[in-house]
Each structure stands twice: as C-alpha cells, then as structure tokens.
Amino acid sequence: MLTAEEKASVISLFAKVNVEEVGGEALGRLLVVYPWTQRFFEHFGDLSSADAILGNPKVKGHGKKVLNSFSEGLKQLDDLKGAFASLSELHCDKLHVDPENFRLLGNVLVVVLARRFGGEFTPELQANFQKVVTGVANALAHRYH
C-alpha cells in the first residue's frame, strides 16, 4: 500500500515519461535480458540480436501499448486487481504467459526509468515505483491463482 505522498511522487514522475520510448526500451530490454520471453513475441519478426530487438517497430509498438496500460493503472492504484482484471484474464487464459514475466518486466521498467531520469529517480522514488510495479505484477498474475 502506498501513502498519498508516495502515489503523488509516482504519478508526478510518470507524467514526464515518453511512453513510446520508455515502453519500447523496457520491452526490448526484457527480450534481450530474459531471452526466453521472446517466445511470446515470435510473430514480431527479427529478434535475433539486441540491436534487432531494440530497433524492431513491433517491439516498440507493443511496449508503448504496455506502458499505456500501466499509465491507466496508475489512475486506480487502490484497485490494481480491478484495473488489470481483463489483462490478467487475457494473459492467463489466452496467451498463457508465465506470470513471473510480469515481475521481470516491472523490474526492467524501474531500470529504464532510473537510466532515463538519473538523479531525479531517487532511492525513495525507486522504492515507490518498485511497490507499484510489484502491485501491477501481482494484479496481472491474479487470474492464475
């Protein structure tokens, strides 16, 4: 659970995020760092190298879509399970995504935010974001339980 101040800090920083760039980088890094996650994206074309993945327009497009969903979830921080119920159902029942991948993507997102925002991404802000990405990962994994 986040305090009102913690929520405000997350929302304030996220308002500065370019979802297309950050989403593409986060998903791209996930696919590079954890290559077994690529099996869910084989239809995206060339995923043969880090350069191919990070330059792949389908990876960038889906990363933007993922971050837009994350952004919508920030509007419902007190009901993340409700906010992500339909996506949890899709990823569990139709796509059969390993729920551990949600945690991995959240951690990669924190890395990308730290890289992009440098000193502005303080340890306290990192802790707040870590709470949020953990909550989102748990909400997305909810259907699996």
Curated annotation (Swiss-Prot):
Chain segments annotated as transmembrane: none
GO molecular function, one term: heme binding
Binding site for heme b: H62, H91
Annotated Globin domain residues: 1-145
Protein keywords: Heme, Iron, Metal-binding, Oxygen transport, Transport
PROSITE patterns assigned: GLOBIN (PS01033)
InterPro entries referenced in this protein's UniProt entry, alphabetically: Globin (IPR000971), Globin-like_sf (IPR009050), Globin/Proto (IPR012292), Hemoglobin_b (IPR002337), Hemoglobin_oxygen_transport (IPR050056)
Gene Ontology biological process terms in this record: hydrogen peroxide catabolic process
Pfam families given in the database record: Globin
Coiled-coil spans in chain: none
One GO cellular component term noted in the UniProt record for this chain: haptoglobin-hemoglobin complex
Subunit structure, interactors included: Heterotetramer of two alpha chains and two beta chains.
Family of this protein: Belongs to the globin family.
Protein name: Hemoglobin fetal subunit beta
